Amino acid sequence: MISFLDKAVLQFDRALQTLVPHAAKATRPSPANTLEEAELDQVERKHSSGLMRINHTGEVCAQALYAGQATTAKLATVRQEMEHAADEEIDHLVWCEQRLYDLGSKPSILNPLFYGASFMIGAGAGFISDKLSLGFVAATEDQVCIHLQKHMAALPMQDAKSKAVLTQMHIDEAKHKAMALEAGGYEFPQPIMAIMTQVSKVMTITTYRI
């Protein structure tokens, strides 16, 4: 059985990997690696950077959410599911970070704040019940999939590298949503989903610019 201290050390290490630039390592190569860099003007590059910054912060939040849930999950199987999903999300984190630097930009300075808030939400959900915790994962991944679809449509047409990253992320996120529901997650009602959408707008509006 893992002690509370062991959990704290593991989660501190995960936080450092998430928040320190270039600290995390992907297990899969970025889908953008095989594509040529497109010619983007200043406005297009700034727009692509803003969208990828939002997606990078979304992955920071996902890492924190899963970390919080894994810390308080009651069943070992649920904790393992959370940790496995977080490991897959690291690929997304690294891909988005890499793409940001390729575009001449950088991650949001607000990431530590969003990480802390997401960790507390995840830990709170896990403390209440595993069913709620898994349901929150499913609802969050549903929101992420919607954002990704919008961003893929909003990217400059010639920015194939960013679109390739978001396309693979969308595939993975949909899988994580299905996994959470199959594991017994609670399916949130539409009013709750609407509230989550409004809350997520705070993150997207701020991180697009900073």
Swiss-Prot record:
Required co-factors: Fe cation
Chief location category: membrane
Residues where Fe cation 2 binds: E89, E141, E173, H176
Gene3D superfamilies recorded: 1.20.1260.10
GO-annotated cellular components: plasma membrane
Recorded superkingdom: Bacteria
Membrane topology: Peripheral membrane protein
InterPro entries assigned: COQ7_proteobact, Ferritin-like, Ferritin-like_SF, Ubq_synth_Coq7
GO biological process assignments: ubiquinone biosynthetic process
EC identifiers of the protein: 1.14.99.60
Localization annotation: Cell membrane
SUPFAM superfamilies reported for this sequence: Ferritin-like (SSF47240)
GO function terms (MF aspect): 3-demethoxyubiquinol 3-hydroxylase activity; metal ion binding
The keyword Metal-binding belongs to this UniProt entry's keyword annotation: yes
Binding annotation for Fe cation 1: E59, E89, H92, E173
Reactions accelerated catalytically: a 5-methoxy-2-methyl-3-(all-trans-polyprenyl)benzene-1,4-diol + AH2 + O2 = a 3-demethylubiquinol + A + H2O
Cofactor detail note: Binds 2 iron ions per subunit.
Pathway: Cofactor biosynthesis; ubiquinone biosynthesis
Keywords: Cell membrane, Iron, Membrane, Metal-binding, Monooxygenase, Oxidoreductase, Ubiquinone biosynthesis
DNA repair recorded as keyword: no
Family in the record: Belongs to the COQ7 family.
NCBIfam families recorded: DMQ_monoox_COQ7
Protein role: Catalyzes the hydroxylation of 2-nonaprenyl-3-methyl-6-methoxy-1,4-benzoquinol during ubiquinone biosynthesis.
Xref: PANTHER family: 5-DEMETHOXYUBIQUINONE HYDROXYLASE, MITOCHONDRIAL, COENZYME Q10 BIOSYNTHESIS PROTEIN 7
Name by which UniProt lists this protein: 3-demethoxyubiquinol 3-hydroxylase
Gene name per UniProt: coq7
